[in-house]
């Protein structure tokens, strides 16, 4: 079992937390992490690209000249693809780029990135993050006390609304819960700040 130091909100050591090696101590599988990141980035694409085909372009209902007798090539519409201003053939249409990977693959990727953060000492555990009201300045003090001045992903337990509201306006700070933290979020952060309750939830979900 891997042990990490446990801090309180003031930055003082409050003991140690024992992490489950099956989740936080595995050999990272880079191939699986890569596949999941590509999947999650694809899901973020809007996919709203669109062009007009010949039926969508305005005009072109009248045959430009008669079929025979002019010496010119036969034409049925000035909105055919070969005309300037005509419709596009086989152009992009709005679509979703999202696709799902197997649940086991997604879980292995999460375990891999969590394990990597723990191995690199970029996993900061706190006993709790409790606030009586949403206060951005108070959360900034917590980060300063914990010597966190880089891009950080804060992982909270469900229902800790005041902490989430306190952190969301800070630059380089992203907030997630134990069930919503994604592989992409974790990889994009320099450090993880995780509450003790969130650690328990992560171990419950990924067990």
Curated annotation (Swiss-Prot):
Pfam families assigned: Ribosomal_L4
Superkingdom of the source species: Bacteria
Biological processes, Gene Ontology terms: translation
Coiled coil: none
Keywords from the named record: Ribonucleoprotein, Ribosomal protein, RNA-binding, rRNA-binding
Keyword Ribosomal protein attributed: yes
Protein name, UniProt field: Large ribosomal subunit protein uL4
